[in-house]
Amino acid sequence: MERRTRNPQSEIRNPQWEGGRVGLGFVRVIAGEFRGRRLKTPVGDRTRPTADRVREAWFSILQRAVRGARVLDLFAGSGALGLEALSRGAATADFVEVHRLALASLKANVKTLKLEDRTTIHRADALEFAERLHPGQYDVAFADPPYAGEQAARLVALFRVNPFARTFSIEHPADQPIPGDDTRRYGDTAVTFIYAP
């Protein structure tokens, strides 16, 4: 698979051009090799990083599954989920993100953690990317789609037809339930887990 961490066509040299900026946010790696490292995130309201407490609970469930795993992070944003997985022992991670500021922060985080050789960054629409995957292509897949819109429902429907990972987990509003094998609620946020048959 082509590595795209340094694709000049999709790289932002100056995020100010996009009417926003990338800064060192309050998102941090929770455990593992990079524990405590802060991650750059886009400044503004276009992305919504997963809260630390939600990620901590999320990974306590997937702790064994991520070790040595091929990981997919859809709607990756700053890459917090995939980078957490790599910190906890995942073998590789593919990140899929379409927004330029989020991509800029993601690329900066991968570079800072020196993870270029274990990551592939795809500038693509997450749903279109997922449609091209093969069954079982990944061990673990994460998704954190925008709360507004139909992306979560469409992605889950796609996974039911084509289970591209052994374990698929998706963040969504707690008041918008998603049918799955297991759902955990954390205040207004929920994470639903779906396992390939």
What is the predicted role of each segment?
Residues 2-197:
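Class I S-adenosyl-L-methionine-dependent methyltransferase catalytic core
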